């Protein structure tokens, strides 16, 4: 394994700065930008370029064949929920190395699915999990350990052990939210087997802090950087990223849905999978897959019960 000190232009002091800034992993270093590395590690941009170039050579980052991509995708894992219909809709569960977005009005089940995934990621692979831990970035004060207990009971898991493997960060503004996402690298490098990152909800702070058309460009730029950091974590560490999103009304809509997901094209392009949640009759929920690189559009019906998500 190549160590930081083995790279050209990296002495003990530079290596220490890189580790302190969360760049101890060679792939994390290879996928950074010179500006990002320069700012976070407090090194010159010229040095940053040389370090990144050396890291890319050590990781052999170059063109690869479609066959190589297929082989790499064999490492992709899936995190299931208690509804077989929902799992089938998204190809077996929430996918690692990807960002999955669910959006819908309040009470449509976004946070409920988030809580369930925080538990099921801890299941062994043969039961639909990844034997992993979860990071839960809570922006709206919706995380409830009591709900985790109910779902863990439904899966007959040890409640204390389940709670210990969920790392919760209460984000109070968009800058804090971005910082907590960046600190996930440190958690992983400390030996925590993080396999799922949940952001519930992604846009709440951005929506509240950047008001008016004149601030839209700044908001979208900041959001894009945040999503890029989340995707980098997903790719580097084979992690699933699950984000919930709000909707807004379309008053000029006479046909189709009267609501749409917020976040604009930046979020639309960043999300690998997009799932629209709707309320149905008799307490049912409807999940519709509206965007995927390889799965067809479709929908399923599920219910939310004390023990979690069920068909």
UniProtKB/Swiss-Prot annotation:
Name of the molecule in the record: DNA repair and recombination protein RadA
Function, in words: Involved in DNA repair and in homologous recombination. Binds and assemble on single-stranded DNA to form a nucleoprotein filament. Hydrolyzes ATP in a ssDNA-dependent manner and promotes DNA strand exchange between homologous DNA molecules.
InterPro entries cross-referenced by the UniProt entry: AAA+_ATPase (IPR003593), DNA_recomb/repair_Rad51_C (IPR013632), DNA_recomb/repair_RadA (IPR011938), DNA_recomb/repair_RecA-like (IPR016467), DNA_repair_Rad51/TF_NusA_a-hlx (IPR010995), Hlx-hairpin-Hlx_DNA-bd_motif (IPR003583), P-loop_NTPase (IPR027417), RecA_ATP-bd (IPR020588)
Keywords of this entry: ATP-binding, DNA damage, DNA recombination, DNA-binding, Nucleotide-binding
SUPFAM superfamilies membership: P-loop containing nucleoside triphosphate hydrolases, Rad51 N-terminal domain-like
Family assignment from sequence similarity: Belongs to the eukaryotic RecA-like protein family.
GO molecular function terms attached to this record: ATP binding; ATP hydrolysis activity; ATP-dependent DNA damage sensor activity; damaged DNA binding
GO biological process: DNA recombination; DNA repair
Sequence positions that bind ATP: 104-111
Protein origin, superkingdom: Archaea
Keyword DNA damage recorded: yes
CDD domains (UniProt xref): archRadA
């Amino acid at each position: 394994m190549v160590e930081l000190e083995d790279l050209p232009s990296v002495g003990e002091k530079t290596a220490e700065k890189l580790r302190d800034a969360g760049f101890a992993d060679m792939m994390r270093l290879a996928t950074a930008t010179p500006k990002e590395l320069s700012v976070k590690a407090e090194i010159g941009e010229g040095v940053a370029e040389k370090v990144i170039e050396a890291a890319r050579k050590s990781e052999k980052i170059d063109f690869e064949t479609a066959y190589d991509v297929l082989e790499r995708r064999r490492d992709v894992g899936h995190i299931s929920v208690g509804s077989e219909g929902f799992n089938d809709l998204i190809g077996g569960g929430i996918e690692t190395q990807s960002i999955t977005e669910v959006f819908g009005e309040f009470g449509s089940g976004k946070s409920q699915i988030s809580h369930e995934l925080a538990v099921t990621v801890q299941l062994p692979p043969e039961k639909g999990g990844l034997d992993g831990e979860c990071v839960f970035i809570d922006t709206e004060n919706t995380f409830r350990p009591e709900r985790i207990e109910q779902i863990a009971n439904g899966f007959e898991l040890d409640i204390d052990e389940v709670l210990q493997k969920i790392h919760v960060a209460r984000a109070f503004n968009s800058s804090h939210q971005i910082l907590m996402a960046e600190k996930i690298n440190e958690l992983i490098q400390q030996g925590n087997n993080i396999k799922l990152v949940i952001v519930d909800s992604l846009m709440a702070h951005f929506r509240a802090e950047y008001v008016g058309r004149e601030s839209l460009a700044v908001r979208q730029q900041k959001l894009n950087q945040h999503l890029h950091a989340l995707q980098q974590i997903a790719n580097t560490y084979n992690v699933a990223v699950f984000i919930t999103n709000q909707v807004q009304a379309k008053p000029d809509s006479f046909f189709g849905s009267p609501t749409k997901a917020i976040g604009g094209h930046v979020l639309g392009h960043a999300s690998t999978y997009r799932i629209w949640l709707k309320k149905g009759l008799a307490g049912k929920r409807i999940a519709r897959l509206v965007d995927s690189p390889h799965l067809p559009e479709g929908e399923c019906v599920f219910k939310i019960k004390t023990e979690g998500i069920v068909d």
